Amino acid sequence: MNHSIIDTHVHVWDLEAARYAWLEGSTSILNRTYRLEEIQVERVSAGVTGGVLVQAENHLEDTEHMLRVARASGWITGVVGWLPLMDPAETARLLTDIYLHEPLFKGVRHLIHGEPDPKWLLQPEVLESLSILAAHDIPFDVVGVLPEHIETAMVVADRVPSLRMVFDHLNQPPIASGVRYGRWGELMKVAAQHFGFHMKISGLGIAGGDFAGRKSEDILPYVSFTVEHFGAERCFCGGDWPVSLLAMGYADTWALNRRLVEEVVGSEEVQAVLATNAIDFYKL
C-alpha cells in the first residue's frame, strides 16, 4: 500500500547567505551549500509529499533563508525556526510583529546540544520564552544527545506543562553501543508519562556517529521501544537530510524509515506515523 509521507526534518543552508559556525573548518561533506533541488528526484521516488525545514543555526538569517526556500519549494509546508529564547521580550516581539503572521512558521528549535550546559533550557529567561511559545501553541524541537538533555526537557515539561515538545532523533538512543536500553531507556519511560512529548524517528542511521554497516535490525529495537512507551500516536518521521548523507542517500533513508515503521506499528497506524501525526503536531 502506498502511503503519503511527511518528512519532518530537512535542512538547507547557504554558506554565502549566512554563517554556520559548526561547519567552519570542517572537512565533512556537509561543509558546503545544500539546496532542496538536490533531492527532488529521490524525494518523488521515495513518495515524500510534504516536508518541514528545520533550523541549523542559532540566528534569524537561517530562519529567513528557510522561509524563502519553503515559499518557493512547492512541497515544504512548514519551518521550524529559531528565536532568541534568552531574550523573552524580543522573542515576544518577533512573534507578534512577524512570525505569528507567517503561515509557514510552525515551530522553534535551538541547538541545545551545542551549548556547554545541558541544562541550558532551564535558565529563567529561556523558560519565560518557552512559556510564550506555549501560550501561542508553538511546539519546540528538543535536539538532545545526552541523557541530561532528556532530564532537562522533563523539567521544562513540569515548568511549562502546556508546551508541546518533540525529541529530535529520539534524543540519540545508544544504537552504536547496542545497549538495551540503558539510561536513555530509563529516562524515556518517565518522559513518556508527560503527554506533551512526541518522538521524531529520524537521524538514526548516524546515531552515535558510528554508522559503518548500520542495519535496520540494529535500529529496530529502539524504534520498537519508543512506540511501545509513547504510542504510535505520538511518533512521526524525518529524514535529516543532508546530515543523513553521512550514512546513506535520501531515498535509502526513507526506505529505512518505512521499513522500521511498518515493522513496529500496526498496518492501520502506518499512515499516522508517516504523515498524519506530523500534520497534527506542526499544524501543517
Model-derived features: where do they sit?
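Catalytic pocket-lining loop regions of alpha/beta-barrel enzymes
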Residues: W120-F236
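Short, electropositive alpha-helical surface patch
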Residues: E61-T77, V160-V166, I219-E228, Y250-V261
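Soluble or luminal CAZymes and related metallo-dependent hydrolases
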Residues: N31-E38, N58-D62, D87-E90, E125, ...
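An N-terminally biased module of ancient metal coordination in phosphate/nucleic-acid-related enzymes
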Residues: M1-H65, A70-R71
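Conserved, mostly hydrophobic/aromatic
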Residues: H9, G51, M66, V79, ...
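Active-site gating/metal-coordination segments in enzymes
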Residues: E61-E148, M154-V155, G203-L204, F211-G213
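Mid-to-C-terminal alpha-helical segments outside catalytic/metal-binding sites
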Residues: N2-I6, I29-G50, F225, H229-F236, ...
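Active-site metal-binding loops of divalent metal-dependent hydrolases
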Residues: V10, A56, L83, L170, ...
